[in-house]
A protein has these predicted regions:
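Phosphate/diphosphate ligand-binding glycine-rich loop within oxidoreductases
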Residues: 61-63, 67-140
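Positively charged, low-complexity intrinsically disordered leader regions
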Residues: 1-29
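Glycine-rich phosphate/diphosphate-binding loops that line cofactor/substrate pockets in enzymes
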Residues: 23-32, 84-89, 157-158
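Amphipathic, non-transmembrane alpha-helical secondary structure
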Residues: 12, 16-19, 79, 83, ...
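Short beta-strand segments enriched in small/hydrophobic residues
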Residues: 32-41
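Glycine-rich phosphate/diphosphate-binding loop of Rossmann-like nucleotide-binding domains
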Residues: 40-54, 138-179
């Protein structure tokens, strides 16, 4: 049996749900969710991707802050900005766009983000919970979470089935395997 998954229709549905949830948070609790997207360097694809994320968040009513740094930014400078964002009560989530310039250690940068604000779910605490199969409310990388959401929306149950995951990256393949 073949199931055609309409990603665009599902994205439209999820965007509408998200926009409504954000509006309710603002109306009932005076809360406006906030995300900071941090980018270092001038990688064209990364600039487009982060701009699109920033614009989408704004359309959904989310406070989005785009922090751009030159390619020669020092690790200390970027860590100082992450520390500010960690302590900023208007920012609920932090995303550091990869790839980073070569002088920056992605592991050090990722580990500096508070686990609760780690959009990509790459902080060791979040990864540990995921790989230990702990249930709870902690960040998991967006792509694997989105894949599982798509399957659930179309009532596709993988229990007892064989599935192939191509790739074993820490951002997609490994988290998807754990989900």
């Amino acid at each position: 049996m073949t199931t055609i998954i309409d990603g665009k229709a599902l994205a439209k549905k999820i965007n509408a749900q998200t926009k409504e949830l954000v509006a309710q948070l603002k109306e009932k609790q005076n809360i406006i969710p906030g995300i900071a997207v941090v980018i270092a360097g001038d990688d064209a694809a990364s600039l487009i991707y982060t701009r699109n994320k920033h614009n989408k968040a704004i359309k959904l009513g989310i406070n989005s802050v785009l922090k751009k740094f030159p390619a020669d930014v020092s690790q200390d400078e970027l860590l100082a900005e992450i520390e500010k964002l960690n302590n900023d009560d208007t920012i609920d989530a932090i995303l550091v766009q990869q790839p980073l310039p070569p002088q920056l250690d992605p592991e050090v940068i990722t580990n500096a983000i508070l686990p609760a604000k780690d959009v990509d779910g790459l902080n060791p605490l979040n990864l540990g919970k995921l790989f230990a199969n702990q249930h709870g409310n902690y960040p998991v990388a967006c792509t694997p979470r989105g894949i599982m959401r798509m399957l659930a929306e179309y009532n596709i149950d993988l229990q007892g089935k064989n599935a192939v995951i191509v790739g074993r990256s820490i951002l997609v393949g490994k988290p998807l395997l754990a989900l």
